[in-house]
């Protein structure tokens, strides 16, 4: 039975306001979660409006299926495939806004059985969709030491990546780890210098979770797909929670707002320049949570909301 873990939606009003909701518009909530953003979007839509929600977490799907609204539909799958979902419904180029709330949700962190948290002992899983792919335990038991170290360094920015990777491999040789507490203890023991403000396993758990769920690849594919999915004037409203996510979003919006970069002095006709295309997006800005929101929900502290608009190019 699914427990009712509380989830406070971060930057709720700001992210939805960023979509500039039209009552008859068609919108996508690519990360339904517990439905905070979706419910607010629905409250602003008229009878002709539509909302397509996506999530790969079966628990989120169960929550979404309880919403009885003809304007609303839910898809169980990764948001990276949003272009396919839209094409199946013959809505390519007709979407008025896409909202993405990236990273792991509070219910996923708080449920020990999901294996996302080093603070709660549970199965070493970390999959956002437990029905697909390798669990964290399975990957750590089969991966090479060098590959584990690369993941910890690349996705966790862990300076002791090699030491921790060696400790993980040695422990798994003795007895395979299957619990989050076991991994947290191995990482803590392998970390020579402790940060008094952060648990030593924080970066390792982040890195393994990102790797197991292909999170950064998911983001990159969804952003790329958004250009074909959005209607002219359609909005992108994206919340990220750590620098790796935000870097991808920021770079994408910046590149698509500049248009093709042609070296100075390159002999090209006006027709050739036009063929290259213009700016795909107009960046509208970024927002951070206010002091009041952070005080009420400390997990909002690192969040960043970036908003962009599809041009007519």
Swiss-Prot record:
A GO molecular-function descriptor: rRNA (cytosine-N4-)-methyltransferase activity
Keywords from UniProt, A to Z, are: Cytoplasm, Methyltransferase, rRNA processing, S-adenosyl-L-methionine, Transferase
Q: Which reaction does it catalyse?
A: cytidine(1402) in 16S rRNA + S-adenosyl-L-methionine = N(4)-methylcytidine(1402) in 16S rRNA + S-adenosyl-L-homocysteine + H(+)
Its GO biological process annotations read: rRNA base methylation
Q: Which residues bind S-adenosyl-L-methionine?
A: 35-37, 55, 79, 101, 108
Q: What is its EC number?
A: 2.1.1.199
Q: Where in the cell is it found?
A: Cytoplasm
Q: InterPro entries under this entry?
A: RsmH (IPR002903), SAM-dep_MeTrfase_MraW_recog (IPR023397), SAM-dependent_MTases_sf (IPR029063)
Name the PANTHER family on file.
12S RRNA N4-METHYLCYTIDINE METHYLTRANSFERASE, S-ADENOSYL-METHYLTRANSFERASE MRAW
Q: What is this protein called?
A: Ribosomal RNA small subunit methyltransferase H
